[in-house]
């Protein structure tokens, strides 16, 4: 479970990825955000969406993002440095 600092960091990063502010991250938004991390392919985006979008609705909800972030703390620390 995320502590208050970790939750605040998840909130901040989620808002960076959720460019249109609709409360969910689309594949397009994910791709745009990941371009900041370097070269990313369409297949990379599809693979990440499949992993993080656990309910399969085509979007990453805040809960799905938070669950992924909590399970991948090292990766999220790296992402936080960039965003």
Curated annotation (Swiss-Prot):
Residues of the EF-hand domain: 5-40, 43-75
Which residues are Ca(2+) 2-binding?
53, 55, 57, 59, 64
Q: Name one GO cellular component term.
A: cytoplasm
- Which PROSITE patterns does the UniProt record give? EF_HAND_1, EF_HAND_2
This protein's superkingdom?
A: Eukaryota
Could you say which residues bind Ca(2+) 1 here?
18, 20, 22, 24, 29
Q: Which GO terms describe its molecular function?
A: calcium ion binding; enzyme regulator activity
Keyword vocabulary terms for this entry = Allergen, Calcium, Metal-binding, Repeat
SUPFAM superfamilies registered for this protein in UniProt: EF-hand (SSF47473)
Q: What is any Pfam family matched here?
A: EF-hand_7
**By its UniProt entry, which PANTHER family does this protein fall under?**
EF-HAND CALCIUM-BINDING DOMAIN CONTAINING PROTEIN
Q: What is this protein called?
A: Polcalcin Bra r 2
């Amino acid at each position: 479970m995320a502590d208050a600092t970790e939750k605040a960091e998840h909130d901040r990063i989620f808002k960076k990825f959720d460019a249109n502010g609709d409360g969910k991250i689309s594949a397009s938004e994910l791709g745009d955000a990941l371009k900041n991390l370097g070269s990313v392919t369409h297949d990379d985006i599809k693979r990440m969406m499949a992993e993080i979008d656990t309910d399969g609705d085509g979007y990453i909800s805040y809960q799905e993002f938070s669950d992924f972030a909590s399970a991948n703390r090292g990766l999220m620390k790296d992402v936080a440095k960039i965003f």
